[in-house]
């Protein structure tokens, strides 16, 4: 990976509001009393997240964090339908996990295959024109709906690299050097800790078999709590099928190779217990140094792994590297392959289905609060400047049982009823709209 690497971002998305319906009537030369002909508003633009295999970082979201889709067009005369707002497509790397909070619950969608789309925010429905409200007893409907507001969401994006093999170990153990000799990747390499400050990917070919290796920046004790480079990089190990645990067998700078092995595995366990059970192959690196040769016998006996999963290598001279790769390829072939084929599929937030007709009534210090998806949507799409708007709301409150429920709860004349952002005064079962600021 070249350039800066960002694997976390927060964005705000705002889908387009629906267009307003029209409250118009036919005006034709020989039709003196033409009926309603107001058209519907267009749908607001949706906002999608799209998994793009050509991206490998969330860097673009460092500069741009807000995305707004277009509003739907208004309806017009002669039943003219407003045009739909243009959709917005936000491209993210394959392997991006999206999270949002809806009604107090956190929902997660994993964009782990090329082409997957997430409908991140749904555009509002266009308002109905007055042609929909005409009946035999109500032939001159002076009402049309406003467009429904588009969904607004704060979304957390987290990139988890898609790699078959993860290179783990303490800083300066030789992970980047190994990646550079087994693949075409060219990570920054220097003889001091924390040279690698971002994950690097490389494709390794063993005969006619290939796999992807991720060089994870060096871990230290306390990484599961965010110490050092911390859990911001541990997340990239989660999707790997196999770990190559690289140990500095020479014990440079007085390090204990056996202690390092156990310390790294403990960090993996504390971060995510399943990671400690992930298949591992150990590479005892720096075998070209005399100090390593003196430690090899002790290390082989101290490591709780079979001999066929412990390899003595020198990434600097390539000693033992080919044998290591053959073993890695063999282990991967024995494991189930991940299903990452392109998928032309649109996902939605996994929100449970609910009956939108349900509602709740709460007694508050200054009145009554009615909540419910259907009734709140009706209020948000009501143009209170239109003469017949209150009449429609009154009918819906009665038909839905809300009026009866309020009376059963003990509402009194003069009490205020709040629904969504609107306030109404209750009087003998009928409501009067209170302009904002009026009590």
Curated annotation (Swiss-Prot):
Cofactor: Mg(2+)
Residue ranges annotated for the OCT domain, each copy included: 351-428
EC number: 3.6.5.-
Signal peptide: none
One cellular component term from this protein's GO annotations in UniProt: cytoplasm
Summary of the function given for this chain in its UniProt record: An essential GTPase which binds GTP, GDP and possibly (p)ppGpp with moderate affinity, with high nucleotide exchange rates and a fairly low GTP hydrolysis rate. Plays a role in control of the cell cycle, stress response, ribosome biogenesis and in those bacteria that undergo differentiation, in morphogenesis control.
Name this polypeptide is given: GTPase Obg
């Amino acid at each position: 990976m070249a350039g800066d690497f960002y694997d976390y971002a927060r964005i705000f998305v705002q889908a387009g509001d629906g267009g307003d319906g029209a409250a118009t009537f036919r005006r034709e030369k020989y039709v003196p009393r033409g009926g309603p002909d107001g058209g519907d508003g267009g749908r607001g633009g949706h906002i999608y997240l799209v998994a793009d295999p050509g991206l490998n970082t969330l860097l673009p979201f460092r500069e741009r964090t807000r995305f707004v889709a277009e509003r739907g067009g208004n309806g017009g005369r002669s039943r003219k339908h407003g045009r739909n707002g243009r959709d917005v497509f936000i491209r993210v790397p394959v392997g991006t996990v999206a999270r949002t909070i809806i009604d107090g619950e956190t929902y997660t969608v994993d964009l782990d295959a090329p082409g997957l789309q997430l409908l991140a925010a749904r555009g509002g429905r266009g308002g109905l024109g007055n042609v929909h409200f005409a009946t035999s007893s109500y032939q001159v409907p002076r009402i049309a709906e406003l467009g429904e507001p588009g969904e607004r969401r704060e979304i957390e994006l987290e990139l988890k690299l898609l790699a078959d093999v993860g290179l783990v170990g303490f800083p300066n153990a030789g992970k980047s050097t190994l990646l550079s000799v087994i693949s075409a990747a060219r990570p920054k390499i220097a003889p001091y800790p924390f040279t690698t400050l971002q994950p690097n990917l490389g494709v390794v070919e063993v005969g006619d078999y290939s796999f992807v290796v991720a060089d994870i920046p060096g871990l230290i004790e306390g990484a599961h709590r965010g110490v050092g480079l911390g859990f911001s990089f541990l997340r990239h190990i989660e999707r790997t099928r196999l770990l190559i645990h690289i140990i500095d067998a020479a014990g440079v700078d007085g390090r204990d190779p056996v202690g390092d092995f156990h310390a790294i595995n403990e960090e993996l366990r504390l971060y995510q217990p399943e990671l400690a059970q992930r298949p591992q192959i150990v590479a005892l690196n720096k075998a070209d140094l005399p100090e390593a040769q003196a430690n090899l016998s002790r290390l082989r006996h101290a490591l709780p792994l079979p001999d066929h999963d412990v390899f003595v290598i020198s990434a600097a001279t390539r000693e033992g590297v080919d044998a290591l790769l053959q073993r890695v390829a063999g282990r991967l072939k024995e494991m189930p392959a991940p299903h990452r084929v392109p998928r032309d599929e649109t996902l939605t937030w996994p929100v449970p289905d609910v009956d939108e007709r349900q509602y709740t009534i709460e007694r508050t210090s200054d009145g009554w609060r009615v909540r419910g998806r259907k009734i709140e949507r009706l209020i948000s799409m009501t143009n209170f400047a239109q003469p017949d708007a209150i009449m429609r709301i009154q009918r819906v409150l009665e038909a839905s049982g809300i009026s009866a429920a309020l009376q059963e709860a003990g509402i009194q004349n003069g009490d205020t009823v709040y629904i969504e952002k609107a306030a109404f005064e209750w009087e003998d079962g009928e409501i009067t709209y209170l302009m904002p600021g009026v009590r």
